[in-house]
């Protein structure tokens, strides 16, 4: 794995007509840190007092329109949405040509709105920084935050440079250049397997599966399925970064169906199937919805069993009817897969806290999910039941047996055993 030895190309994105002093300062810091700033101007009304690498006219053209047409669109919201569309298309093209080593954007709410779109289309692993007056605030929908995005509060930054602003901007620019210089590109030495899970207090199969897969010559990346982790998993799947996946914690689908903010977006369980990646699926933690522990419990869940994991996140079981609905959603997603899918159903339970005597034990509700899943899965999907809990060795062994069979049949590429 190698890091950049030359000057990394860093996109510097902002409205040069209103923030020229700050953007020029950022470009200077990037150069002094050993990077090559590539200025992209997303102004609408005015012009920057410098020559950007890509002008607002280039951005508008990438959106299939003109700056004047954008001005005539009627209001600042629609105008910035069009500029976001153009900037995203422009940056996507640069990235596909290998001309982006990192990005940093500067903005208030309008600039942040635009920058979130750009960060979302850059591949996982490309350093992404946004310096924003609303960094990590409640204004940002979780599903719009790229999984490896870094944000820094633009403290005291409106209307020109000052000592606080210089400190913030210099830190951010130094960070993006340093990240671009030192980032290690993922190694292709061994095939990569993706796996989803929660922490070992809830799900434990990875303790058995990871070393067994590594013995077979694979690297294994395990994603913490609490919203952002699922988003990262989906991003790598969309890039065809896995040779196979063990998607054993699909709780984020339950979260999405229940309206929780702990979401990985509407495309959870969809990118591996689109990419033609073989999938082994299990319903880990599908019986509960995660909510912020510091918020009031929504009315619909007030009477449901509740477990606070810590001061940040709490789990609430969903009703039998909701579990049936989730089963139908999961089955519908799997039907669209372009590669083999195996669904393994552990009839003894789907997470550690649903065991007999534990706070989330609801055998009738679990039975509702199992029953609905049996009827919803079609014959195009390999369906296996295991008379065991998902955390039992029997479950992990069955999953590994399916994987080994797929390797023997050539469905999954063989591992690289040293």
Curated annotation (Swiss-Prot):
Highest taxon in the source lineage: Bacteria
Q: Which Pfam families does the protein's record reference?
A: UPF0261, UPF0261_C
InterPro entries from the xrefs? Tobamovirus_resist_UPF0261 (IPR051353), UPF0261 (IPR008322), UPF0261_C (IPR056778), UPF0261_N (IPR044122)
Task: Quote the HAMAP family the UniProt record gives.
Answer: UPF0261
Q: Which family does it belong to?
A: Belongs to the UPF0261 family.
Provide the protein name: UPF0261 protein BRA1168/BS1330_II1159
